[in-house]
Protein backbone atom coordinates (compact mmCIF):
# COMPACT_ATOMS: atom_id res chain seq x y z
CA UNK A 1 0.00 0.00 0.00
CA UNK A 2 1.38 3.41 -1.01
CA UNK A 3 1.83 6.13 1.58
CA UNK A 4 -0.31 9.22 1.05
CA UNK A 5 1.32 11.82 -1.14
CA UNK A 6 1.62 15.49 -0.30
CA UNK A 7 1.18 18.35 -2.71
CA UNK A 8 4.52 19.65 -3.93
CA UNK A 9 4.24 22.94 -2.05
CA UNK A 10 3.82 21.14 1.26
CA UNK A 11 6.53 18.60 0.52
CA UNK A 12 9.20 21.22 -0.11
CA UNK A 13 11.07 22.34 3.01
CA UNK A 14 11.42 25.92 1.75
CA UNK A 15 9.38 28.55 0.02
CA UNK A 16 9.98 29.81 -3.49
CA UNK A 17 11.00 33.19 -2.11
CA UNK A 18 13.68 31.58 0.06
CA UNK A 19 14.94 29.61 -2.95
CA UNK A 20 15.15 32.76 -5.05
CA UNK A 21 16.92 34.59 -2.24
CA UNK A 22 19.63 31.92 -2.27
CA UNK A 23 20.20 32.36 -5.99
CA UNK A 24 20.30 36.14 -5.91
CA UNK A 25 17.09 36.48 -7.93
CA UNK A 26 15.15 38.14 -5.15
CA UNK A 27 13.05 41.06 -6.21
CA UNK A 28 13.53 43.79 -3.63
CA UNK A 29 10.37 44.88 -1.89
CA UNK A 30 10.55 48.53 -0.96
CA UNK A 31 8.36 49.55 1.95
CA UNK A 32 7.68 53.16 2.75
CA UNK A 33 9.17 54.39 5.99
CA UNK A 34 11.98 51.84 6.36
CA UNK A 35 14.62 54.56 6.05
CA UNK A 36 18.26 53.65 6.55
CA UNK A 37 17.47 50.15 7.78
CA UNK A 38 16.02 49.19 4.39
CA UNK A 39 18.90 50.84 2.54
CA UNK A 40 21.43 49.03 4.74
CA UNK A 41 19.74 45.67 4.17
CA UNK A 42 19.63 46.24 0.39
CA UNK A 43 23.31 47.25 0.25
CA UNK A 44 24.23 44.22 2.35
CA UNK A 45 22.37 41.89 -0.04
CA UNK A 46 24.02 43.51 -3.08
CA UNK A 47 27.46 43.14 -1.47
CA UNK A 48 26.72 39.49 -0.70
CA UNK A 49 25.68 38.80 -4.31
CA UNK A 50 28.80 40.54 -5.67
CA UNK A 51 31.01 38.58 -3.28
CA UNK A 52 29.40 35.31 -4.38
CA UNK A 53 29.88 36.19 -8.05
CA UNK A 54 33.53 37.08 -7.43
CA UNK A 55 34.14 33.82 -5.55
CA UNK A 56 32.56 31.76 -8.33
CA UNK A 57 34.67 33.62 -10.92
CA UNK A 58 37.85 32.91 -8.94
CA UNK A 59 36.96 29.24 -8.61
CA UNK A 60 36.36 28.92 -12.34
CA UNK A 61 39.62 30.68 -13.30
UniProtKB/Swiss-Prot annotation:
Disulfide bonds: none annotated. One of its GO terms (cellular component) is cytoplasm. Pfam families: LEP503. This is Lens epithelial cell protein LEP503. The gene is Lenep.
Amino acid sequence: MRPPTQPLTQALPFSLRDALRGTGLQVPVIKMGTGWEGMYRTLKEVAYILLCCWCIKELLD
